[in-house]
Amino acid sequence: MSRILDNEQMMDEEMVERTLRPQYLQEYIGQDKVKNQLKIFIEAAKLRDEALDHALLFGPPGLGKTTMAFVIANELGVNIKQTSGPVIEKAGDLVAILNDLEPGDVLFIDEIHRLPMAVEEVLYSAMEDFYIDIMIGSGDANRSVHLDLPPFTLIGATTRAGMLSNPLRARFGITGHMEYYEEADLTEIVERTAEIFEMDITHEAAKELALRSRGTPRIANRLLKRVRDYAQIMGNGLIDETITDQALSMLDVDHEGLDYVDQKILRTMIEMYGGGPVGLGTLSVNIAEERETVEDMYEPYLIQKGFIMRTRTGRVATRKAYEHLGYEYMEK
């Protein structure tokens, strides 16, 4: 069975997210710091009749970076064109996209840290001075062509801001750090989703689901669908606190939001390495997961919740991890 808390998007989930996606900042729940900053920057850009400065949105998967990009475009009243780093394989691909932009348009590049360097270098002049120089022809006929671009706003999204080159990062005038959601905001998101899809859910059930959704709206919405299934088959359709707890326990999602993979990480650290320190590569091999998957998807939440610590010599399981899994903790 696929991991219920996996943040990899599937086609049906993309359709669900489009249905749930807020259109404007006032509809966007959570991320208040980012929203308040953007509201000022957007209003100022509109008053000056200028394109908004380029913006970089970064943070763990599933926190609404794509949604925020579309909200920004709506607030500006402009079109948005969407692509992703892995799709743009060569400079010519990017040139074609840039050449199709209208004045003020938003270009959204997801996973921008995965742009090839040759493509990234084309962006430098495009972002800074709104032009690109490209080489056409070959051999003796090879020549440089200068193309002016309309003012536009590039919005980049990444889960790994540290992988962006310094020259690219420096060209973003706006940065927004998307953080894990507070329980109250996530509860509101769960209740909003339930209302849109006409699910019958109690406030206590929404709170319980929010508490166990790793501070991530995408996970909360995914779990809500599975709890709804459970309520329809094992109950009378009402999603209450008892049904929610039973459904999430069946899915191996505990009261801290940890699933079997998270628990496997912690148990491996404790049972095989005495709680650590253990290197990320070694840990990844032992749990049969890719290093990047552990680093991007599991580790941030485990650190944020205080279950593991990063040290110079490796990852270390904390007292909280021992106690949560029922192990005796001994000071080292």
Curated annotation (Swiss-Prot):
Pfam families: AAA_lid_4, RuvB_C, RuvB_N. Its EC number is 3.6.4.-. It is found in: Cytoplasm. This is Holliday junction branch migration complex subunit RuvB. GO terms for biological process: DNA recombination; DNA repair. Keywords: ATP-binding, Cytoplasm, DNA damage, DNA recombination, DNA repair, DNA-binding, Hydrolase, Nucleotide-binding. ATP binds at residues 20-21, 62, 65-67, 128-130, 171, 181, 218. The lineage of its organism: Bacteria, Bacillati, Bacillota, Bacilli, Lactobacillales. It catalyses: ATP + H2O = ADP + phosphate + H(+). InterPro entries: AAA+_ATPase (IPR003593), AAA_lid_4 (IPR041445), DNA_helicase_Holl-junc_RuvB (IPR004605), P-loop_NTPase (IPR027417), RuvB-like_N (IPR008824), RuvB_C (IPR008823), WH-like_DNA-bd_sf (IPR036388), WH_DNA-bd_sf (IPR036390). Residues 255-332 are annotated as: Head domain (RuvB-H). The RuvA-RuvB-RuvC complex processes Holliday junction (HJ) DNA during genetic recombination and DNA repair, while the RuvA-RuvB complex plays an important role in the rescue of blocked DNA replication forks via replication fork reversal (RFR). RuvA specifically binds to HJ cruciform DNA, conferring on it an open structure. The RuvB hexamer acts as an ATP-dependent pump, pulling dsDNA into and through the RuvAB complex. RuvB forms 2 homohexamers on either side of HJ DNA bound by 1 or 2 RuvA tetramers; 4 subunits per hexamer contact DNA at a time. DNA binds at residues 291, 310, 312, 315.
